[in-house]
């Protein structure tokens, strides 16, 4: 894999670096070899996929991190949120030269867990894994998953369930909530953060008379198309 670690080049107030908390008794769930090929995983990466997808193995080229963001829940301002059970464990180049995030869900508690245990369960991991594949096949914007693992580790929900982890991919894990958090708590970082987002994801907007407005327009349009395709 060829890494392009750009998110951890941002101001460290925007994230918390930490390793994942590995699952006990990790076992293979399913591995998406076609997607791994798109991401240029080599033979060693593929042979170690269970260790990667269960938090046992990390990449020296990218210290894992949890992102902080804010937002609304149930129509009310919820303040600071953040990656409460997921970690960005890598940013790599795919075979088209595009930067792709590797995000491990169920990786353990973080400073943003808000009393949660930081875990995911097999039931919800399988649902997200299948839903991502279905949405991508239907042409609807969605994350995609390299694979998932299950384990012998119990996780308490309404009943005791099996702990699991999902390694999902996307060209971007930056949310609208990142901008909300920065605007609310670190407004001095807003201009630089927006500039980086434009450079990374919408470089064509740099040529516009008002780059920020052009960027916002692009995001609104793509979001509207995505929501329309949900119907």
Residue ranges of predicted features:
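Broad phosphate/nucleotide-binding scaffolds in NTP-utilizing and phosphate-metabolizing enzymes
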Residues: 1-126, 130-176
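ATP-dependent phospho-/nucleotidyl transfer catalytic cores
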Residues: 125, 155-231
């Amino acid at each position: 894999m060829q890494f392009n670690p750009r998110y951890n080049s941002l101001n460290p107030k925007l994230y918390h670096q930490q390793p994942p908390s590995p699952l006990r008794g990790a076992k293979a769930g399913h591995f998406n070899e076609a997607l791994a090929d798109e991401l240029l995983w080599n033979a060693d990466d593929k042979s170690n996929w269970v260790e990667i997808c269960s938090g046992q193995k990390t990449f020296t080229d990218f210290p894992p991190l949890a992102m902080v963001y804010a937002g609304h829940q149930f129509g009310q301002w919820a303040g600071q949120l953040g990656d409460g059970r997921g970690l960005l464990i890598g940013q790599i180049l795919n075979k088209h030269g595009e930067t792709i995030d590797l995000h491990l869900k169920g990786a353990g508690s973080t400073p943003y867990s808000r009393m949660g245990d930081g875990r995911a369960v097999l039931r919800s991991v399988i649902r997200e894994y299948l839903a991502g594949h279905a949405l991508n096949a239907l042409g609807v914007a969605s994350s995609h998953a390299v694979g998932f693992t299950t384990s012998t580790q119990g996780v308490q929900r309404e009943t005791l369930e099996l702990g699991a982890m999902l390694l999902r991919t996307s060209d971007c894990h930056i949310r609208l909530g990142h901008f909300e958090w920065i605007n609310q708590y670190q407004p001095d970082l807003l201009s630089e953060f927006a500039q980086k987002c434009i450079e990374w994801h919408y470089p064509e907007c740099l040529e516009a008379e008002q780059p920020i407005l052009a960027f916002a327009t692009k995001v609104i349009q793509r979001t509207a198309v995505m929501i329309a395709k949900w119907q």
